[in-house]
């Protein structure tokens, strides 16, 4: 099992931006790593505490039709001066990839 991660920031704490960024980041992770949905074991998503208008995993699940993949959401630990409005995704895969 391997893990792949990525991060993206959004312009505003609004559903539109959360949805667009989540789908974009997930799609980019799949594309850059030549992954198929079948390779995914589970997905972990964290957001900074200034994102509270929507669940990124909901939009990813709907857009990519992920019915049997576990998705968990977490709040990112707050650190003074850290990057605001940030969504991070960690995907666990059952495939060997060259990193």
Language-model features: locations:
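Terminal domain-initiation and capping elements
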Residues: 1-99
């Amino acid at each position: 099992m391997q893990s792949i991660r990525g991060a993206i920031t959004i312009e505003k704490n609004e559903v539109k931006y959360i949805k667009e960024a989540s789908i974009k980041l997930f799609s980019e992770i799949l594309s850059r790593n030549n992954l198929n949905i079948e390779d995914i074991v589970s997905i972990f998503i964290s957001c900074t505490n200034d994102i509270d208008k929507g669940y990124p995993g909901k939009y990813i699940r709907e857009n990519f039709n992920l019915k049997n993949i576990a998705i968990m959401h977490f709040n990112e630990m707050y650190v003074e001066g850290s990057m605001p409005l940030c969504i991070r995704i960690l995907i666990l895969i059952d495939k060997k990839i060259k990193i």
